[in-house]
């Protein structure tokens, strides 16, 4: 299994769990995303290479940006334009999706942090819209 295939599997599982909240997995961006009137809520996934068929390391970031989002970075991210940016790797949480067992473990960890960080902040921000 390669990174794209593994991410498609993980993204599909996450969309299955969080789809009722409006989250969709975008294969091209490797993000699980939901938009509201004023914000974009996402989990962004990446990999730094060095992967094998049995070991696929991923980086997971939980991000909330104001809309419209400035993809070119003209607006410096701050608490007003990016109310949440949390990287698992920066917090020494390393995930591997290289096989089914590792995928299940990574899925549980991604969901734990989603439920702990992104969902409460999303509910708080949506209540103000």
PLM-predicted stretches and their roles:
Residues 1-13, 25-29, 33-129:
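Intrinsically disordered, low-complexity regulatory regions enriched in serine/threonine/proline
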Residues 18:
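Acidic, metal-coordinating catalytic segment for phosphate/diphosphate chemistry
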